[in-house]
Swiss-Prot record:
This is DNA mismatch repair protein MutS. Transmembrane segments: none annotated. The keyword DNA-binding applies. Keywords: ATP-binding, DNA damage, DNA repair, DNA-binding, Nucleotide-binding. This protein is involved in the repair of mismatches in DNA. It is possible that it carries out the mismatch recognition step. This protein has a weak ATPase activity. Belongs to the DNA mismatch repair MutS family. The lineage of its organism: Bacteria, Bacillati, Bacillota, Bacilli, Lactobacillales. ATP binds at residues 602-609.
Amino acid sequence: MAKTNISPGMQQYLDIKKDYPDAFLLFRMGDFYELFYEDAVKAAQLLEIGLTSRNKNAENPIPMAGVPHHSAQQYIDVLIELGYKVAVAEQMEDPKQAVGVVKREVVQVITPGTVVDSAKPDSANNFLVAVDFDGCRYGLAYMDVSTGEFCVTDLADFTSVRSEIQNLKAKEVLLGFDLSEEEQTILVKQMNLLLSYEETVYEDKSLIDGQLTTVELTAAGKLLQYVHKTQMRELSHLQALVHYEIKDYLQMSYATKSSLDLVENARTNKKHGSLYWLLDETKTAMGMRLLRSWIDRPLVSKEAILERQEIIQVFLNAFIERTDLSNSLKGVYDIERLSSRVSFGKANPKDLLQLGHTLAQVPYIKAILESFDSPCVDKLVNDIDSLPELEYLIRTAIDPDAPATISEGSIIRNGFDERLDHYRKVMREGTGWIADIEAKERQESGINNLKIDYNKKDGYYFHVTNSNLSLVPEHFFRKATLKNSERYGTAELAKIEGQMLEAREESSSLEYDIFMCIRAQVETYINRLQKLAKTLATVDVLQSLAVVAETNHYIRPQFNDNHVITIQEGRHAVVEKVMGVQEYIPNSISFDQQTSIQLITGPNMSGKSTYMRQLALTVIMAQMGSFVAADHVDLPLFDAIFTRIGAADDLISGQSTFMVEMMEANQAIKRASDNSLILFDELGRGTATYDGMALAQAIIEYIHDRVGAKTIFATHYHELTDLSTKLTSLVNVHVATLEKDGDVTFLHKIAEGPADKSYGIHVAKIAGLPKSLLKRADEVLTRLETQSRSTEIISVPSQVESSNAVRQGQLSLFGDEEKAHEIRQALEAIDVMNMTPLQAMTTLYELKKLL
């Protein structure tokens, strides 16, 4: 960019921009935020705003674009949503009083991970994640700047780091080390994350006390440093650092959560049709966030699960009190976000009114909880801090009709401050005084249309038309001359005006100071407000789960220590809700101590995947503490769920369905324990038939012999059902069908034993394929089944049988000497000693095709 003959103002812009090269710089100039040079060109395209130039007649005009300061937030939101950073430079002094260039400074850098204000507020968390690496393990810290939530853990490998970032749905990742090229590709290209870097650890360790590893400390410290550097203020709302271990929760990868539609429907990317949608009867934004967290991280502690169950049971048993509780929670605003706005110095009168309204509801909520008269609920009661003194301050100080801005006045209630009341009285009575002066002068002067007007330039004045100029009294003095009239003042009017203007200015200044003082007082309560927010959120989620349990007739699950799964008449909770109770066909699921694998066969569209997902959702809901969709449930506590359900290529990373399958299978067999749950649907379908079958069998055997996890393996390879004869912990089940007069009905019920056929052509018929095509497919199927039966009787003869056949002049098996010679040559070329089992299977398959 050409920067010759730069003005002092533009030099100031360039000096500031130099410190923020990776951000759009919004440069406050009067009522606009201006952008220049490359920022202006790019922003004009992204924001669809006009592009002009600052010095149009210069040899090298400076590109310029701007947005009004009062609507800047909506433009900032667009840039942040697109993954950019925005640095906001404000005027630090009154331009009218400035000597030379107005002093400007960047007051905040807004990034995708540090959004606090938004024109489109979202109740969901917005986590900023920091990752550090010590050469052995990874430290991962995350924070929601808008709520103050702050957590840290350590992880063994980059795969775990990736999964945790995905689970947190982060948009920005802060790194304290250099990534490999492959890792960079994963985070930037595959996960579409903004990467930021920080080398410095925050000096103040008060927020990160605790028994942490070195890499956890550096990850948390660098995260704190970055947040303070971008927000440029003390963040009193940040909560004490919480250390957590992945193993403390039911572990699930992002792919598993996606395939089970836990927080959003995988097909629509919407909340509707997800478990989150089903369970969400929360009344507060805080409750919504906490519910999502519970779904993301079910518990593995039986004691903690039973504690949640007990409270839900108490709520279920008291319909009237629970209804009152739900209604009271509707009056609770987002305390966490309001606290952060106070901490950031951005809380306006409406924010404080919302906080006050919430605090006014708390005593009612506490009284309702006390009425349940239950020891488990009493723990929640004891955690509720009503903060009556803060509620009183807001109620008596802030006018209930106060505007959303602090510059318009009318914020503070009458009676709160004597000086403010005096100034308001002067302004109120001054209006009456002016009316009295107007009436008196009209009568004394004889000017019947004499009136007093006001504008900013001339203040209060008498308006006299030219036709009445001869009647103007001597004590009037001229203030302005117009074409058809003149404006006059009097000493009395000037005195009243002075008193009113002084009162207005003093009132405005005093009211602002009072509000800032009140906001500072509110800030001292932030820690107590955050604790209250957590308790109210917990109450909200528990009442939500109680409402859902009652509405859908869910039951309280039991847990055992002997690895037994018993689900009687279980339902897929989400599918049932979408279809309706009358339409849904329940299924029982049973694994005794000896059974670790169910091999399920059956037609497409018959309900195999739903059966598998039903088990997963039942486990997740149970370990959340929720009641579940069944007549009776008794489960072991699982430590992890691994799934491969549904075929999909990973187009961004260029991985095929088969590769994705193998990678997910690898994660399962490497990480699963005998306390895990594995759900594999049609594994191996992305490759050749015999390859797929060989891999499927090998994986089943590996899980059976080495892992021992409870597993449901759905397959179309009917040959695999024979594994039940040699794998003692494997049982066959199938989806029952009813075949009559050529028509097939899928019963959607699981029965013991293997399926007899797949009914693929019948599914094609349902899909509406042409009759001629279906007829041809039936012919081909009959032929293939005949060939299959004929080849099944061919077995490898023993060495004795072979020699006897030669002596007796046995006829050629192939009936074709030329083909026999071809096969003999192929056999002789095989290096048996150096073949892998998979190569041997493939070669055998190729030889079979020669028959």
